[in-house]
Amino acid sequence: VTLTRGDLVGYVERDLDADLARWFPGRTPVAVPEQTRPVAPFLGRLAPADAAALAAFDRRVRSGRMPQFLDIYSWSYGFDFAANGCGIRDSDYETELTDEDVYSIGADGGGNLYVVLTTGQIGIWFHEEEVVEEGTRFDDLDVFVWSVVRYQAVRAGVLERAAVEADFLSLGQDGVLEPELGLLHSMK
């Protein structure tokens, strides 16, 4: 059976906790300061399904119980771009975005941030160019989190690449398939 985006709607709320417990039981839990930028104002800019996924993710991040799997720290979750003097440009390298247009949910290990856009897409904000690149995107948070959890499980040696590769291909996400930056490339 081919996995579709529709199959993953509600993943963060429904299945994330079980997957994290299965593959990452001993990992240190995420801890962000109480004063971390609130997500509530951003939720109103999202479609209902995207807002539900981000709200569910935020509850887990702030619970102090979610295992670390996405470089979620005080500097990467709810990052305040303006207060830190950082610009944000869309993939056309011209359209200026603001903190109202994105919400950062973690880092990639190289100083780049994963951001939720008001379209519901997830992209990578590259710190050197201060741009959210087009070829790095995921259609929504449920698909992104599902993909990153499995990517990290493969990297940790608790899941075989062959067990997820067909699903990654069927979902057709740029953030997985991009030849140089995609998750599949990084699993080699």
Language model: regions and residue ranges:
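A surface-exposed partner-binding patch
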Residues: 1-113, 176-188
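Acidic, proline/glycine-rich low-complexity IDRs
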Residues: 149-188
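Short catalytic/ligand-binding loop motif for oxyanion handling, primarily in non-cytosolic enzymes
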Residues: 112-115, 133-134
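Generic alpha-helical structural element
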Residues: 8-9, 46, 130-133, 169
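Compact, glycine/acidic-enriched structural inserts
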Residues: 123-159
